[in-house]
UniProtKB/Swiss-Prot annotation:
Residues 175-185 are annotated as: Homodimerization. Homodimer. Interacts with VAMP2 (synaptobrevin-2), GDI1, NRDG1 and PCLO. Interacts with prenylated Rab proteins (including RAB5 and RAB6), and with the members of the Ras superfamily HRAS, RHOA, TC21, and RAP1A. It comes from Mus musculus (Mouse). Keywords: Cell membrane, Cytoplasm, Cytoplasmic vesicle, Golgi apparatus, Membrane, Synapse, Transmembrane, Transmembrane helix. It holds the Pfam family PRA1. Residues 165-185 are annotated as: Required for interaction with GDI1. It is a multi-pass membrane protein. Residues 30-54, 175-185 are annotated as: Required for interaction with prenylated RAB3A and VAMP2. It is found in: Cell membrane; Cytoplasm; Golgi apparatus; Cytoplasmic vesicle, Secretory vesicle, Synaptic vesicle. This is Prenylated Rab acceptor protein 1. Changing V185 to M/N/Y/H/E/Q/T/S/L/W/F/G: Retention in the endoplasmic reticulum.
């Protein structure tokens, strides 16, 4: 009982990220480790969207500096903006949801089938990679009808506009030693 209270206090002290667990659908491995690293290096959203920190750059040199430093500094935040745009695109397109359901349903059926026995076609055993390629081929017409290609380019374009404008107009925090530098006249 006391150990549970200590764990609960530790979780409360760590904030929201301690209580938000990664979904069980993401298998342990490189993908999960990458996502955990992104979550660990995320910058505070309050400073990310602080309207007082937005201004127009004075010249092209400052614009380039802002782009490079903000993309480096807010990289994890930008990844989650990208994932949010993907989620928005999928949720607002019912046909794309159907296409994704068909694809993941076919993959799940193939997964269950390979647990029971090997799939044999024309006397040859079909590898799991070929089975998943077949699932992709079967669901391709659904993705084509759903306009998945345009959805991909919409997400990429919206991401570039949002991230590019944020990185260009968000003022950088002065680095150590940068405050004392004088500009040439």
């Amino acid at each position: 009982m006391a150990a549970q209270k200590d764990q609960q206090k530790d979780a409360e002290g760590e904030g929201l990220s301690a209580t938000t667990l990664l979904p069980k659908l993401i298998p342990s491995g490189a993908g999960r480790e990458w996502l955990e690293r992104r979550r660990a290096t995320i910058r505070p959203w309050g400073t990310f969207v602080d309207q007082q920190r937005f201004s127009r750059p004075r010249n092209v040199g400052e614009l380039c500096q802002r782009l490079v430093r903000n993309v480096e500094y807010y990289q994890s935040n930008y990844v989650f903006v990208f994932l949010g745009l993907i989620l928005y695109c999928v949720v607002t397109s019912p046909m794309l949801l159907v296409a994704l359901a068909v694809f993941f349903g076919a993959c799940y059926i193939l997964y269950l089938r390979t647990l029971q026995s090997k799939l044999v076609l024309f006397g040859r055993e079909v590898s799991p990679a070929h089975q998943y390629a077949l699932a992709g081929g079967v669901s391709f017409p659904f993705f084509w009808l759903a306009g998945a290609g345009s959805a991909v380019f919409w997400v990429l374009g919206a991401t570039l506009v949002l991230i590019g404008s944020h990185a260009a107009f968000h003022q950088m925090e002065p680095a150590d030693g940068e405050e004392l530098q004088m500009e040439p006249v």
